[in-house]
A protein has these predicted regions:
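Juxtamembrane intracellular "pre-TM" segments in multi-pass secondary transporters
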Residues: 2-6, 189-223
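Helix-loop boundary and gating motifs at the non-cytosolic
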Residues: 3-54, 221-225, 231-248
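Helix-to-loop junctions at the C-terminal end of transmembrane segments
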Residues: 61-72, 271-282
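Cytoplasmic membrane-interface "Motif A"-like loop-to-helix N-cap segments
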Residues: 70-82, 280-291
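C-terminal ends and interior cores of transmembrane alpha-helices
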Residues: 83-96, 293-306
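Hydrophobic core of transmembrane alpha-helices in multi-pass small-molecule transporters
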Residues: 99-113, 312-325
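Glycine-rich segments within core transmembrane alpha-helices of 12-TM secondary carriers
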Residues: 135-151
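Conserved small/polar residues in nucleotide/adenosyl-binding loops
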Residues: 328-337
Length: 338
């Protein structure tokens, strides 16, 4: 059994805390509300900006993944993506709204590509016996980051600070909490080979891998199924949920923040539970349970708004918090199983 230094593990966990501060405050809540409620953009325009970022991530993701595989270069790639995200987040709202949206797209690209590399570093801080548990701890740390980001943003807002100043505070928090990962995480040696590959070549590898996947029972179904449910969940938690609560459900920004805070608390508890359960039962069973619970949650949200049963929104918040943590935790673990 490979032994991991506590300093390396804690530093890896702190990065999860750092990037979840960003994920919750910027795309998850404040930027989307600022763009739609303050600047008059529509949720469709927000969705288009988010989709544009995701298309670029889909193109560059295989290249980033290939570059980080088979060599000790993950931390360098993670540093590049993190700087991209932090710098563009710090500048949000500094210029006009159009440039701010472009910066938002850049920050999303940096965040998501960084997550690809960060997930790959899981093998450097865990072994086969405790990988699910460590991943679950990472998610729990991540949602602690959401609470920190939520707390700082709420205090700043109550003191009269602007959205722009909240954006900058998030960038600073991301920087502070991510630094230990670059200083203390020790990468496991895989290969001294330096991978040189173009973006086009990486896409060709993806196409060939897709064709090759048909030789493995269940893998094609897994990839197709994951695409559909992951796309739906990413769309929901990357800003449209906060806009829905304010614009469609008619809640105040304060009420929507309370619901999301409730979901975070549930997520922290669920992170450890799902980590232990994944080690015992495997990610496949838990993913099926999670998808079923997502269907129930979204159905309750529709009923709540159609029949003006706002108490159901809070029930949805509880289920959504548990579902979100299951999805986030199993994202890395399930991929390794296949």
């Amino acid at each position: 059994m490979d032994k991991v230094k506590p300093k390396s593990l804690i530093s890896w966990l702190l990065f999860d805390l750092a990037n979840t501060v960003y994920a919750f405050v910027i795309p998850g809540l404040y930027f989307s509300v600022w763009l739609v409620s303050e600047k008059g953009w529509t949720d469709q325009q927000l969705g288009f900006a988010t989709s544009s970022a995701m298309i670029i991530v889909a193109i560059l993701g295989p290249w980033v993944g290939r570059k980080s595989d088979g060599s000790e270069g993950k931390k360098r790639l993670l540093l590049l993506m993190t700087i991209m995200c932090i710098a563009s987040t710090f500048l949000l709202g500094t210029f006009n709204v159009q440039i701010s949206v472009i910066l938002f797209v850049i920050s999303l690209i940096g965040f998501n590509l960084g997550s690809v590399v960060y997930d790959a570093l899981l093998i450097s801080v865990s072994n086969e016996e405790n990988r699910g548990k460590i991943s679950g701890m990472g998610v729990a740390f991540g949602y602690m980051g959401s609470l920190i980001g939520f707390g700082v943003a709420t205090v700043l807002q109550s003191l009269g600070y602007s959205y722009v100043e909240i954006f900058r505070s998030v960038a600073i928090l991301f920087l502070i909490f991510s630094l230990p990962a670059f200083l203390f995480v020790e990468e496991k040696f895989v290969s001294a080979e330096k991978v040189k590959i173009s973006i086009l070549s990486s896409l060709n590898i993806v196409i060939k891998s897709w064709k090759h996947s048909r030789q493995y029972k269940g893998l094609t179904r897994f990839l197709v199924g994951r695409f559909f449910y992951a796309d739906a969940i990413n769309t929901l938690i990357s800003g449209l949920l906060a806009v829905y609560l304010v614009e469609e459900a008619g809640l105040t920004p304060a009420d929507s923040q309370n619901i999301l805070a409730l979901a975070i608390v549930i997520s922290i508890i669920g992170g450890y539970i799902f980590g232990k359960a994944a080690d015992k039962y495997g990610p496949r069973r838990l993913i099926l349970i999670s998808i079923f619970c997502w269907i129930i949650s979204l159905s309750l949200a529709i009923v709540a708004t159609e029949f003006n049963q706002m108490w159901l929104i809070y029930v949805t918040g509880v289920l959504g918090g548990f579902n979100t943590v299951s999805y986030t935790h199993l994202r890395a673990h399930e991929t390794m199983e296949y």
